[in-house]
Amino acid sequence: MGASVSRGRAARVPAPEPEPEEALDLSQLPPELLLVVLSHVPPRTLLGRCRQVCRGWRALVDGQALWLLILARDHGATGRALLHLARSCQSPARNARPCPLGRFCARRPIGRNLIRNPCGQEGLRKWMVQHGGDGWVVEENRTTVPGAPSQTCFVTSFSWCCKKQVLDLEEEGLWPELLDSGRIEICVSDWWGARHDSGCMYRLLVQLLDANQTVLDKFSAVPDPIPQWNNNACLHVTHVFSNIKMGVRFVSFEHRGQDTQFWAGHYGARVTNSSVIVRVRLS
């Protein structure tokens, strides 16, 4: 007989481990190129993380050039106007750190509603409230309010119920030189209405305040009451502060309502989708 042949499995040769890739050291980039790279990072990440990397990065994040580069990417009419304002409306101490444009880019205050919880999605959170009668409650809308983030509303009772927010414009990202530039406007809006079976009254007061919360300008609305049997009437109040006085730093937004039947429960004015929006004047 012939000799037997061994057919054992061939031993596997382990694959060589890949060479570790060398990390890209951004600190070796020229400052001009590093500035371009950082301009593609989200503003909140720049302020919260990139600023902590090293002194060089902190200097770039705290400076003006990075934020002007970010703003320059918006080629719309508002974007171009903002870039012009950012270049011209700077602090007298141009080298002050950190540059206010960082907070401005992170918070994006232009064109968004600065009122928190405008429709009662979070109950009464963010509002300073005074309860009259049986107090404020949140209910679903009886009439659709266009553009509202939620079809819910705040409902008043048989005596005046009041609620208020005071907005700190600098905290929202608007710096003093921009606020005093004469190139912005403040648009306020509120929706109010009634149940079909109960009349109601409504009041609105919006005030522009200085740093000491002294009133510099105001708008008030005192519309006629909505009568009983009204087909769930829903009305819209708007106003634009177009000639902003020097020194405005806060906006106080306050509205109130009650029913006209003096019924226990919640049959009074229904308010929702309140807004305060800062816009750039394009002309």
Curated annotation (Swiss-Prot):
In its UniProt record, which GO terms are filed under biological process? ERAD pathway; glycoprotein catabolic process; SCF-dependent proteasomal ubiquitin-dependent protein catabolic process
Give a brief account of the tissues where this protein occurs: Predominantly expressed in brain, heart and kidney. Expressed at lower levels in liver and lung.
A single GO cellular-component term from the record reads: cytosol
Q: Pfam family example for this protein?
A: F-box-like
Extract the ranges annotated as region (Disordered). Answer: 1-23
Q: InterPro entries given for it?
A: F-box-assoc_dom, F-box-like_dom_sf, F-box_dom, F-box_only, Galactose-bd-like_sf
Query: Residue limits of the F-box domain?
Result: 23-70
Record keywords? Ubl conjugation pathway
Q: Quick check: keyword Nucleotide-binding in the entry?
A: no
For the FBA domain, which residue ranges apply? 104-280
Q: What does this protein do?
A: Substrate-recognition component of the SCF (SKP1-CUL1-F-box protein)-type E3 ubiquitin ligase complex. Able to recognize and bind denatured glycoproteins, which are modified with complex-type oligosaccharides.
Question: What does the record note on quaternary structure?
Answer: Part of a SCF (SKP1-cullin-F-box) protein ligase complex. Interacts with SKP1 and CUL1.
Q: What is this protein identified as?
A: F-box only protein 27
